[in-house]
């Protein structure tokens, strides 16, 4: 039987669901940026809305102060954030009535400020065992997810003009666009966001050079085996004070390792570039998960800078605390459906995780895919039907990715046309590939081509997929190579 020593308090869990759907529901890049801003700040907006309504929530959980159920119960606050991580928010309220009042404020704020962000709320009576309370919260959260239905806060009539993608009522016309309430709020959030060093997607996609610089990359990075680490940090403790302190330290450390330091490294890396193409913007960044959109030419620099920062951090950590992650890169034109492109990036990340799990999730992997002519299948189907036996992806970061980059730089000496011919010959058959290798070797003996090198063969195929954006020389160099 659970010990009821929670001073009448309740512990609540808030979980934003369908985050990617909310962000990528539109293909307008301003609204994607605005949607990501709203999601990033949704809990902060809740705290401010609650304060305006006279509900005091102590959200200063990062200060390092110890948490105590008794101290909270005797404080002047109505609620206190236990910790926030992975898109989840844990709060303790003084009573169930306070929890209900807070939810009413939160719901109204979501409707007025975001329109359709969906948040699942669950609460349990506080006991003296945090781990048991958290387990009950997760179970309740899962139950709500599986049984609840997502409602859209609008109704339409036969005379109502609706958005053709979301079927929400049109409330405003701006810049020759018909906008729903959700779109208006996302654009408003976009206009307010002007973080120095990160570019708006209009700048990233190169709208001024449509057709030549309109390639974007969606990069999804996710930490390996993080659920095990969360369990490990509270393995031999159960009280609220001990567990909360441990989880707060873990959440802050995770954010620094997977988001803050890598983002700083990416900014520093791209600042070295002067071609105007190397720009990026965060879409989601929290805990061990990060989603970026950048000019496709910058994707390789972004990923290498990210993992360099992660490796640098690991040098000062003991083996059992080192952090590892996998990244997926999906490249597409700026007019492609972003929701589909994101799913490909997520599946590329999962492709790396499958390999990493075979090594106890202690290896970083990168996978990529160029969405050339629309997205009609999932990654697994694409690999099985179009690239089986041809690709070496995913790449282990420290050795295999470096080898891939070196091979791409070395083979650029033979020119774009020859690299493309080699990849096309692989698809036709082994004899075609051997013929092309011998032909090119006769002109470029220093290129190191060998028709019997299976590893190099797969590298060449992968290089050909992204040669134009990651390895291509200038037009003058290409002309000289073909002469």
Predicted regions and their residues:
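Regulatory and interdomain segments flanking nucleotide-handling catalytic cores
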Residues: 1-483
């Amino acid at each position: 039987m659970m010990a009821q020593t929670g001073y009448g308090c309740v512990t609540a869990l808030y979980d934003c669901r369908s985050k990617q759907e909310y962000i990528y529901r539109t293909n307008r890049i301003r609204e994607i940026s605005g949607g990501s801003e709203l999601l990033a700040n949704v809990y902060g907006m809740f705290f401010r809305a609650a304060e305006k309504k006279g509900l005091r929530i102590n959200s200063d959980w990062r200060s390092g102060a110890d948490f105590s159920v008794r101290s909270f119960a005797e404080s002047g606050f109505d609620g206190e954030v236990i910790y926030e991580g992975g898109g989840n928010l844990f709060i303790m309220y003084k009573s169930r009535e306070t929890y209900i009042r807070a939810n009413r404020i939160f719901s109204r704020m979501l409707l007025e400020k975001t329109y359709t962000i969906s948040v699942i709320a669950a609460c349990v009576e506080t006991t003296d065992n945090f781990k048991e309370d958290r387990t009950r919260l997760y179970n309740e959260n899962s139950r709500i997810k599986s049984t609840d239905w997502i409602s859209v806060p609008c109704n339409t009539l036969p005379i109502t003009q609706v958005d053709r993608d979301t079927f929400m009522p049109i409330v405003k016309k701006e810049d020759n666009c018909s906008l729903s309430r959700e779109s208006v709020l996302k654009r408003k959030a976009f206009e307010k966001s002007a973080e120095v060093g990160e570019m708006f997607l209009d700048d990233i996609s190169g709208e001024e050079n449509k057709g030549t610089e309109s390639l974007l990359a969606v990069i999804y990075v996710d930490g390996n085996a993080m659920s095990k680490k969360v369990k490990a940090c509270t393995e031999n403790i159960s009280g609220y004070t001990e567990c909360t302190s441990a989880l707060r330290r873990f959440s802050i450390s995770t954010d620094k390792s997977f988001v803050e330091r890598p983002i700083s490294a990416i900014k520093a890396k791209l600042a070295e570039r002067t071609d105007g193409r190397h720009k990026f913007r965060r879409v989601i960044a929290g805990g061990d998960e990060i989603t970026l959109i950048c000019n496709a030419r910058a994707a390789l620099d972004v990923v290498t800078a990210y993992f360099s920062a992660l490796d640098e951090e690991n040098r000062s950590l003991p083996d059992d605390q080192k952090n590892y992650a996998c990244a997926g890169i999906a490249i597409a034109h700026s007019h492609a459906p972003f929701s589909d492109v994101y799913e490909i990036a997520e599946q590329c990340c999962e492709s790396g995780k499958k390999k990493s799990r075979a090594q106890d999730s202690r290896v970083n992997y990168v996978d990529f895919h160029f969405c050339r002519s629309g997205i009609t299948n999932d990654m697994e189907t694409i690999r099985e039907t179009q690239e089986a036996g041809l690709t070496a992806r995913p790449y282990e970061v420290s050795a295999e990715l470096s080898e891939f980059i070196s091979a791409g730089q070395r083979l650029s000496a033979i020119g774009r046309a020859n690299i493309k011919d080699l990849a096309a010959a692989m698809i036709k058959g082994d004899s075609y590939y051997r013929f092309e290798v011998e032909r090119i070797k006769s002109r470029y003996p220093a290129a190191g081509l060998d028709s019997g090198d299976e590893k190099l063969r797969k590298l060449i195929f992968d290089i050909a997929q992204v040669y134009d954006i990651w390895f291509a020389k200038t037009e003058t160099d290409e002309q000289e190579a073909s002469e």
